[in-house]
Amino acid sequence: GFDVVDNIK
């Protein structure tokens, strides 16, 4: 989502 917190998709 933001930065790299929930960008693990």
Swiss-Prot record:
**A biological process (GO) annotation for this entry?**
hydrogen peroxide catabolic process
**Cofactor names:** Ca(2+); heme b
Keywords, sorted A to Z: Calcium, Cell wall, Heme, Hydrogen peroxide, Iron, Metal-binding, Oxidoreductase, Peroxidase, Secreted
Q: Where in the cell is it found?
A: Secreted; Secreted, Cell wall
Its EC number is 1.11.1.7
The main location is: secreted
Molecular function as annotated in GO: lactoperoxidase activity; metal ion binding
EC class (word): oxidoreductase
Cofactor remark from the record: Binds 2 calcium ions per subunit.
Q: Which GO terms describe its cellular component?
A: extracellular region
Chemical reaction(s) catalysed? 2 a phenolic donor + H2O2 = 2 a phenolic radical donor + 2 H2O
What this chain does, per the record?
Removal of H(2)O(2), oxidation of toxic reductants, biosynthesis and degradation of lignin, suberization, auxin catabolism, response to environmental stresses such as wounding, pathogen attack and oxidative stress. These functions might be dependent on each isozyme/isoform in each plant tissue.
Family per record:
Belongs to the peroxidase family. Classical plant (class III) peroxidase subfamily.
Q: Report what the protein is called.
A: Peroxidase 1
From what organism does this protein derive? Cycas revoluta (Sago palm)
Q: Lineage of the source organism? A: Eukaryota, Viridiplantae, Streptophyta, Embryophyta, Tracheophyta
